[in-house]
């Protein structure tokens, strides 16, 4: 394993985050935040780090807060944050890819060693595309798909970016203490393939299904919530804060008020996998099982697609690839089979939030949409025309995305997602290889 060369700029103690008054007793919870922001999100990360410092003043005293920061303007460093004060524990002497699994593991293990606790939780901040696979965590062509943590590897916001696949990320997390929750403040990370891969590393996975604004959550209010003691209600509290009236988004993107985000209880995912296998088997009639993602439209305003969150060439072009699991199953199963399957999804997705449908609001409520003045350019995927292609409602939105195999992916994804999806345990567990794929 290639070692990270670093320079210590402060004296390190065995437990740099520990409370001196506690003696040898462990602190209750260590919260680790991982900023993979050596990219075009760097300035937004700096803003969120300032918010973290503000929020730390209201964090429970029996919690550690430790942050890894990789920006385009500085060498990577790790700091603890306590009561509005920061203490740099380590500064690295050279840039590196924060998305490298070896580097990531070394960083997170160091954070754990400096802030031992009875409980752990991790937030990953940066770019994300969920259960999408890359070749060796590198994306070099226009058809390439990605995963989490785009990093240029040097002090720049452009250049060759490397990502980490979520299968690899799961192997990293499996070598750390079990997490009470893992949260992604990153686009499109709440997919069933990703959640299933991480199921043995965390109790809860909290993440958006769709694209999220570059400036992330409001950490001034979010950080205190991260220390709340009731773990069963914590995912709901986090999501309510992330999507609440105190978020930063509506003041910047005038049409934007919410995201599709959910919390998954990972202990329920094996049961969901078994139920999904049974449901898909009921549809199989030989050859390839092709799930329909295009409901029949009775009128011009009816949806012509199941809800989708990502396309084969990115968020704004290509063919839909990450679909809402509930909407797809609802569109394909018999009424009886759907009602038998649905409770398993609802037990896994314990809380979810969504924006209003365009048919209710009259505007693209998901993101900037048609208005090029919001972020300086239009967002075609989230234009009113695209937004009208599916229906967001309590009946259709399930809070968990999935890959739906389609032949078109063989020529429109690199690597071929029809092959790459078998890197995921979920794919084989629910039997896609048995249904002709």
Regions picked out by a protein language model, each given a short descriptive name:
Residues 24, 137-437:
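Terminal, contiguous helix-loop blocks that mediate binding/assembly
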Residues 41-73:
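N-terminal carbohydrate-binding/catalytic regions of secreted carbohydrate-active enzymes
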Residues 27-30, 60-65, 115-121, 176-181, ...:
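Loop/turn elements at helix/coil->beta-strand transitions in domains of secreted/extracellular proteins
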Residues 1, 11-31, 404:
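Bacterial Sec-dependent N-terminal signal peptides
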Residues 27-38, 84-93:
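Acidic/histidine-rich, surface-exposed loop or edge segments in extracytoplasmic proteins
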Residues 69-85, 92, 96-177, 186-188, ...:
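Catalytic-core segments of thiol-dependent peptidases
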Residues 32-34, 125, 403-405:
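Short hydrophobic segments within beta-strands
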Residues 32, 48, 103-104:
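A short beta-strand-loop element at or near the start of a globular domain
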